[in-house]
Amino acid sequence: MRFDIKKVLELAEKDFETAWRETRALIKDKHIDNKYPRLKPVYGKPHPVMETIERLRQAYLRMGFEEMINPVIVDEMEIYKQFGPEAMAVLDRCFYLAGLPRPDVGLGNEKVEIIKNLGIDIDEEKKERLREVLHLYKKGAIDGDDLVFEIAKALNVSNEMGLKVLETAFPEFKDLKPESTTLTLRSHMTSGWFITLSSLIKKRKLPLKLFSIDRCFRREQREDRSHLMSYHSASCVVVGEDVSVDDGKVVAEGLLAQFGFTKFKFKPDEKKSKYYTPETQTEVYAYHPKLGEWIEVATFGVYSPIALAKYNIDVPVMNLGLGVERLAMIIYGYEDVRAMVYPQFYEYRLSDRDIAGMIRVDKVPILDEFYNFANELIDICIANKDKESPCSVEVKREFNFNGERRVIKVEIFENEPNKKLLGPSVLNEVYVYDGNIYGIPPTFEGVKEQYIPILKKAKEEGVSTNIRYIDGIIYKLVAKIEEALVSNVDEFKFRVPIVRSLSDINLKIDELALKQIMGENKVIDVRGPVFLNAKVEIK
């Protein structure tokens, strides 16, 4: 809210210390349900794979590499050139592209009758136009997604009727089967690099340092926790007369050091792909101090002069590649690549912060005057909670409700002797820790020994909802006062003895959070003695 600057400065001029304390009242607290952690920052969330791709892009650029986009669709002929006798085994893991054939469809009398039976008046001119459409489609001059429109146009009917003509008069279109081509989807980035370099080698000055991060496709027998049929490769090439495997080691270290890896081992790869020069194909193992283990993260090698010669490339080329998803799993701590790449198909796990933000006060006073009264009543209860019983605290306030003057008297009492006005759990605060919900007291005095370790850990490492038992209970009490005013109830009693569940302290939890807690066998333990007794009179 805005405040009176002139008045504030005048107060400060008279007595700065007093003004400093009193102006605290000008900074209003937020509504209980708009406080942290229910109040959350709103921002977009990148996908871990896309985030890793961007980090890799920047890492390559910092190392002086130029970004390229390599061909995704590769003719099988290129695989034969690159792999030689190994090509058939490689092509077995490639996806071939297929397309529907374009049938040679005629327009005989039988089809004309079918069209007429649809209520279409078809004369010789329309027949000729329709024949021309079918002929142009066969030749490829008309695209498949334009065929219905062109049929409708030829017959001078609506698009809907054109579709009906295609379905009923030309059923042969339904029986078409895809026919494979010699085109494949890139199964690894190398197949694209040979094509790119064969074009660049005579145009650009050496050495060349190029990188490309893009999708590849591999026809796996099945997808599992570490293999997908579609993945991203972060690949680079270094092209120059003096290029060797040492360049691969340098690039691997320079690239991966930017992701927290500190030590590196290079081991000969037993696979020995034929597009690499013998004894150059190398696996990169890197040590990540956070994970405390050595991890295989990349492969590099020098392309075979035989494969290079088939593309008129006459200088050595070092190629390094790593799977983006593999690196992302390491960075973000995933154990299953499917759950990381496609989280929408897997169980989403709420963090403690998420769950804490999903715990809210159930019944809250609607009118500002009563909401403020509830806050005042909370402070009074806290100030008097340790009064020896029998005892009571009476609070009387006057309100204007629906144009009428109403006096509200609230009495908080404890009649049983040798007790206190309120029970020891009134200041317990609700925390979320490791997916569990706990009610934790300000101190652990009087708490059973076996509960202290977990409660201490939850308080230190968990997320507080910033809601105490007394908050929820008093908000409910004052909300009932509002209800009583509406219903013309003159008095009522209110009692909360022992808390056993969230509802006992006027809290509710989102169904998503509750589902996770129940599904993971977590606990909601907010038990505690409150012993709050109140009597309300309205005049």
From Swiss-Prot:
<dbReference type="GO" id="GO:0000049">
    <property type="term" value="F:tRNA binding"/>
</dbReference>
<dbReference type="Pfam" id="PF01409">
    <property type="entry name" value="tRNA-synt_2d"/>
</dbReference>
<dbReference type="InterPro" id="IPR006195">
    <property type="entry name" value="aa-tRNA-synth_II"/>
</dbReference>
<dbReference type="GO" id="GO:0005524">
    <property type="term" value="F:ATP binding"/>
</dbReference>
<keyword id="KW-0436">Ligase</keyword>
<keyword id="KW-0648">Protein biosynthesis</keyword>
<dbReference type="GO" id="GO:0004826">
    <property type="term" value="F:phenylalanine-tRNA ligase activity"/>
</dbReference>
<dbReference type="GO" id="GO:0006432">
    <property type="term" value="P:phenylalanyl-tRNA aminoacylation"/>
</dbReference>
<dbReference type="InterPro" id="IPR005246">
    <property type="entry name" value="O-Pseryl-tRNA(Cys)_ligase"/>
</dbReference>
<dbReference type="GO" id="GO:0043816">
    <property type="term" value="F:phosphoserine-tRNA(Cys) ligase activity"/>
</dbReference>
<dbReference type="InterPro" id="IPR041590">
    <property type="entry name" value="SepRS_C"/>
</dbReference>
<feature type="binding site">
    <location>
        <begin position="275"/>
        <end position="276"/>
    </location>
    <ligand>
        <name>substrate</name>
    </ligand>
</feature>
<keyword id="KW-0067">ATP-binding</keyword>
<comment type="subunit">
    <text>Homotetramer. Interacts with SepCysS.</text>
</comment>
<feature type="binding site">
    <location>
        <begin position="188"/>
        <end position="190"/>
    </location>
    <ligand>
        <name>substrate</name>
    </ligand>
</feature>
<keyword id="KW-0030">Aminoacyl-tRNA synthetase</keyword>
<feature type="binding site">
    <location>
        <position position="319"/>
    </location>
    <ligand>
        <name>substrate</name>
    </ligand>
</feature>
<comment type="function">
    <text>Catalyzes the attachment of O-phosphoserine (Sep) to tRNA(Cys).</text>
</comment>
<dbReference type="GO" id="GO:0005737">
    <property type="term" value="C:cytoplasm"/>
</dbReference>
<dbReference type="Pfam" id="PF18006">
    <property type="entry name" value="SepRS_C"/>
</dbReference>
<dbReference type="InterPro" id="IPR002319">
    <property type="entry name" value="Phenylalanyl-tRNA_Synthase"/>
</dbReference>
<keyword id="KW-0547">Nucleotide-binding</keyword>
<protein>
    <recommendedName>
        <fullName>O-phosphoserine--tRNA(Cys) ligase</fullName>
        <ecNumber>6.1.1.27</ecNumber>
    </recommendedName>
</protein>
<comment type="similarity">
    <text>Belongs to the class-II aminoacyl-tRNA synthetase family. O-phosphoseryl-tRNA(Cys) synthetase subfamily.</text>
</comment>
<feature type="binding site">
    <location>
        <begin position="233"/>
        <end position="235"/>
    </location>
    <ligand>
        <name>substrate</name>
    </ligand>
</feature>
<dbReference type="InterPro" id="IPR045864">
    <property type="entry name" value="aa-tRNA-synth_II/BPL/LPL"/>
</dbReference>
